[in-house]
């Protein structure tokens, strides 16, 4: 299970944004006290023509905020636990609540395949099942910074 791929679900707000966090450690030891963990932030931001979904390392910016009661003066993103997760990929990204199907989805310079199921947009007044965009194998890794752009 440690090396199983992840599915990231993004439920857009009425403003077309979303945020969430992922914290991982080995779940068996106290090695997190020495900074052996992964703490990622995920953000979706919207403009009129794009939605950008990004993953950033939160622990490097705020090492004391990752684990309650543990003060870390520094954090190394290449710690032993994070290195053990190198290559663990984001298997898919699912975005709920888009108004329309994107014209294209990119990861860097790579065009990504996706499917879109019509449904209710997050900022509409209709009730029902949310629209669903599924991006399979985007090329992202759980321990890396990355950005996916949806062109609307």
Language-model features, listed with the residues they occupy:
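Accessory, solvent-exposed terminal regions and/or long lumenal/extracellular loops of proteins
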Residues: 1-111, 125-129, 136-152
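Solvent-exposed serine/threonine-rich low-complexity stretches and specific carbohydrate-binding patches
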Residues: 110-122
């Amino acid at each position: 299970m440690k090396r199983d791929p992840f599915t990231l679900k993004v439920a857009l707000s009425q403003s077309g944004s979303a945020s969430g966090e992922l914290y991982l450690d080995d779940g068996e030891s106290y090695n997190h006290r020495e900074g052996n963990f992964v703490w990622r932030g995920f953000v979706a931001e919207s403009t009129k023509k794009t939605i950008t979904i990004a993953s950033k390392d939160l622990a490097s910016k705020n090492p004391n905020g990752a684990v309650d009661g543990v003060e870390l003066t520094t954090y190394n993103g290449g710690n032993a636990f994070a290195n053990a997760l190198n290559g663990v990929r984001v298997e898919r990204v699912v975005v709920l609540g888009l108004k329309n199907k994107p014209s294209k989805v990119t990861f860097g310079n790579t065009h990504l395949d996706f499917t879109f199921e019509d449904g209710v947009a997050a900022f509409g007044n209709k009730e029902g099942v949310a629209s669903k965009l599924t991006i399979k194998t985007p090329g992202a890794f759980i321990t890396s910074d990355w950005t996916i752009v949806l062109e609307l």
